[in-house]
Amino acid sequence: MNKLIRRAVTIFAVTSVASLFASGVLETSMAEFISTNVISLADTKAKDNTSHKSKKARKNHSKETPVNRKKVAPVHESKATGPKQDSCFGRMYTVKVNDDRNVEITQAVPKYATVGSPYPVEITATGKRDCVDVIITQQLPCEAEFVRSDPATTPTADGKLVWKIDRLGQGEKSKITVWVKPLKEGCCFTAATVCACPEIRSVTKCGQPAICVKQEGPENACLRCPVVYKINVVNQGTATARNVVVENPVPDSYAHSSGQRVLTFTLGDMQPGEHRTITVEFCPLKRGRATNIAMVSYCGGHKNTASVTTVINEPCVQVSIAGADWSYVCKPVEYVISVSNPGDLVLRDVVVKDTLSPGVTVLEAAGAQISCNKVVWTVKELNPGESLQYKVLVRAQTPGQFTNNVVVKSCSDCGTCTSCAEATTYWKGVAATHMCVVDTCDPVCVGENTVYRICVTNRGSAEDTNVSLMLKFSKELQPVSFSGPTKGTITGNTVVFDSLPRLGSKETVEFSVTLKAVSAGDARGEAILSSDTLTVPVSDTENTHIY
């Protein structure tokens, strides 16, 4: 029991001396003296054994000396620093402080060294977590001289070496090597401390939304045919785009089924890489160029636009026909038909069809197919701006108003295209009024009667109007009575009939005058005929022999 108590007292004494030395209270010589006496009192063995006990006490002292008030880990041997043949110190061993919170620090020193020869002290700091402002302090042994350090530093007035590490990451190591030269025999106690501020990092992911808009639409479209555009919106950024809105003003030359002039589409939030497609349909109102503009906006971002220009084409064919407003029956009349393409597209399979009224005969139509009163021309293509001209020669057999109808039909990329025109000609007939005068009894005795018959015939193709007849007789004949389609008057030897308002084509009327022979001789009877057609009156004379 006494032996156990003596051993415990010895360990306690050596540990106390080591603590006082590490804190700088005892000098090296004093610590060595106390340690030696304690060991001698504890064990009365031979001097050699005493020396062995003293060395063992130092080793125990090193194991149990607290560093920064942390548990000292078991010693680990390491190889000596520097070339083996030049070393004046023993194998390195390591003292480790377990600290799972901030920084783990280890210190490696040789087991023994030679007075006057430098030996290394290796300090290794390992980050247990991310730390900043890491300060490592080493207390130099009292009976030793500072030689150098790596990284380099300068001892303070109280014999301390200080290194500052701005940042030591988790798992990262920082090594410091200090060379000191012992000046006296004894134990060289070296203490190192570390102070660090744990670094807490917070990560906020920052991104930038990038809304892009593209638009697809036709380069060409047809008038009055639907035009469809596709608006593609995509978030090519790295953050969510909030409150994405697409606005599409309706172009002036377009109309939308909703009647609105600005179309608005609310897309809401769009994640990175998200894609949306909007389809809009318009109806073109007029030909020409139309530009559709789509604008996209989102919260905190600038507006982007995309536009597509479409040429609105109108397939158009025009036809006109020109001819005489009036003409005489049986006189040829020429009609000129003009066909043109004022549109934007090529017209194919163009058919020009001219239909004449019954009673009109086609005399000539170059390059056409004639069938009764129909004339047809065909053309494979009619380019924009191109025009064609056709002529047709006709003649009417009867008077009247006749219309010439022309229809043009064609095909294009926008469908069929049709146009029509007409021309009306008034065909006039020509009145041809003739008169024939004959006496029924010739010769005639004085005192007897004879009858003059006057036949008026319109041999023409048109009626005659205001047909008037007047008869004059010589003194040998005395008018007694008359008859006809109109009334008449007898004045002396003259008979005048009222005008006949109308004498139709191929119509014949007859006038008669009864005459009494009053004296012998060669009598004469003259009939004078006038009408609207006869600008100069026509006369006819008949003679009668009276005996």
Curated annotation (Swiss-Prot):
GO biological process: regulation of cell shape
Protein name, per record: Large cysteine-rich periplasmic protein OmcB
Ranges for region Disordered: 45-84
Keyword Magnesium applies: no
Annotated source species: Chlamydia trachomatis serovar L2 (strain ATCC VR-902B / DSM 19102 / 434/Bu)
Note: In strain L2 the origin of the observed doublet has been shown to be different post-translational cleavage.
Subcellular location: Periplasm
Extent of Basic residues compositional bias: 52-61
Gene this protein is translated from: omcB
PANTHER family: LARGE CYSTEINE-RICH PERIPLASMIC PROTEIN OMCB
Keywords: Cell shape, Disulfide bond, Periplasm, Signal
